[in-house]
Curated annotation (Swiss-Prot):
Subunit and partners: The cytochrome bc1 complex contains 3 respiratory subunits (MT-CYB, CYC1 and UQCRFS1), 2 core proteins (UQCRC1 and UQCRC2) and probably 6 low-molecular weight proteins.
GO biological process: mitochondrial electron transport, ubiquinol to cytochrome c
Recorded topology in the membrane: Multi-pass membrane protein
Membrane-spanning parts: 25-45, 69-90, 105-125, 170-190, 218-238, 280-300, 312-332, 339-358
Family: Belongs to the cytochrome b family.
Gene assigned in the entry: MT-CYB
Binding annotation for heme b b566: H89, H188
Other facts noted in the record for this chain: Heme 1 (or BL or b562) is low-potential and absorbs at about 562 nm, and heme 2 (or BH or b566) is high-potential and absorbs at about 566 nm.
Name of this protein: Cytochrome b
Protein keywords: Electron transport, Heme, Iron, Membrane, Metal-binding, Mitochondrion, Mitochondrion inner membrane, Respiratory chain, Transmembrane, Transmembrane helix, Transport, Ubiquinone
Source organism of this protein record: Chilabothrus monensis (Mona Island boa)
Length: 371
């Protein structure tokens, strides 16, 4: 066994002394994934993937299964926690230049895509009104693909409309994808330890490192305790805070909800999709809103890794963060002025961040007189 793997086995991996709390979200994500797999298994034991019984089986789990309400709420709110952690994790990677560890960043972006797919399939399973219509709207975007679109949509649905075969295959995919996520997470962690994690200064920390255990394990445990407390508080006192009222009604293909809305963690992508008044253009923008993260390591031009000493880039980054929140907010509103205009401007600003990133780096190099 190589020396590095032996160190990893005993938690003795050398880590920079100056990594901050923003580096704790990796271990929090690992905890979230374990929680999701465990609660998901116990829910799958009682769930029935049939359009006539799915909604009733969720009610049965909540009312009749011992601690079923706890499992169901932990799984649903745990998914929201997962996305809160992953968005902060990505933001930290963008701010501190962690994306320059290319293999780790690319595997992480692939993980995000897999996670979003898993969450989408999971949202359809209760077969509530919003579950059904969200599935209809999002899968229907495949028809925008020239030549192959209609065939692919029919193949995905298992028929000419969303029906029992669709629910069955979505359940199968929702069950199998987390195992792929766990495998890729292991690869993500191994690739990270090939080079070692970055630090807030963005400098080489080889001269100042400490063992991961006990120093950073206790630091991680503090944040894990806080996250667990927050999760249990929401589960106990505000279990429906992230739920859509429409999803408490059984799916009815004959009644369209007044306002179509996916889960809150997809709203930024949905807002970008809605901001473009063209089906194919919207579908491409939706895909690019995630895929554009893959370009970041290849467009970095600054001689400095972290944004800590780059005030212009800091302003750009926090504008990007505000834009993300604005798109999320506009996606909850009806498709009418002024919300359409706001979402279009915000969507443009979202993509401009990734264009400004290399330009600002080049300008900073000129100002600092780097060759």
């Amino acid at each position: 066994m190589p020396h590095q793997q032996i160190l990893m086995l005993f938690g003795l991996v050398p880590v920079a002394t100056n990594i901050s709390t923003w580096w704790n979200f990796g271990s929090m994500l690992l905890t979230c994934s374990v929680l999701q797999v465990l609660t998901g298994f116990f829910l799958a034991v009682h769930y029935t993937a049939n359009i006539n019984l799915a909604f009733s089986s969720i009610i049965h789990i909540t009312r009749d299964v011992p601690y079923g309400w706890l499992m169901q709420n932990l799984h649903a709110i745990g998914a929201s926690m997962f996305f809160i952690c992953i968005y902060i994790h990505i933001a930290r990677g963008l701010y501190y230049g962690s994306y320059l560890n290319k293999e780790t960043w690319l595997s992480g972006t692939t993980l995000l895509i897999m996670l979003m797919a898993t969450a989408f399939f999971g949202y359809v399973l209760p077969w509530g009104q919003m579950s059904f219509w969200a599935a209809t709207v999002i899968t229907n975007l495949l028809t925008a693909i020239p030549y192959l679109g209609n065939t692919m949509t029919t193949w995905l649905w298992g028929g000419f409309a969303i029906n029992d075969p669709t629910l069955t295959r979505f359940f199968a995919l929702h069950f199998i994808l987390p195992f792929g996520i766990i495998s890729l997470s292991s690869l993500h962690i191994m690739l990270l330890h090939e080079e070692g994690s970055s630090n807030p200064l963005g400098t080489n920390s080889d001269i100042d490192k400490i063992p991961f255990h006990p120093y950073h394990t206790y630091k991680d445990l503090l944040m894990l305790t806080m996250m667990t407390m927050l999760l249990l508080m929401i589960v106990s006192f505000f279990p429906d805070i992230f739920n859509d009222p429409d999803n408490f009604s059984k799916a009815n293909p004959l009644v369209t909800p007044q306002h179509m809305k996916p889960e809150w963690y997809f709203l930024f992508a949905y807002g970008i999709l809605r901001s473009i008044p063209n089906k194919l253009g919207g579908a491409l923008a939706l895909t690019m809103s995630i895929m554009i993260l893959l370009t970041v390591p290849f467009t970095h031009t600054s001689k400095m890794r972290s944004m800590m000493f780059r005030p212009f880039m800091q302003l750009t980054f926090w504008t990007f963060t505000a834009t993300f929140l604005v798109i999320t907010w506009t996606a909850t509103k009806p498709v009418e002025p002024p919300f359409t205009t706001i979402s279009q401007v915000a969507a443009l600003m979202y993509f401009l961040f990734f264009i400004f990133n290399p330009i600002m780096g080049w300008m900073e190099n000129k100002i600092m007189k780097y060759n």
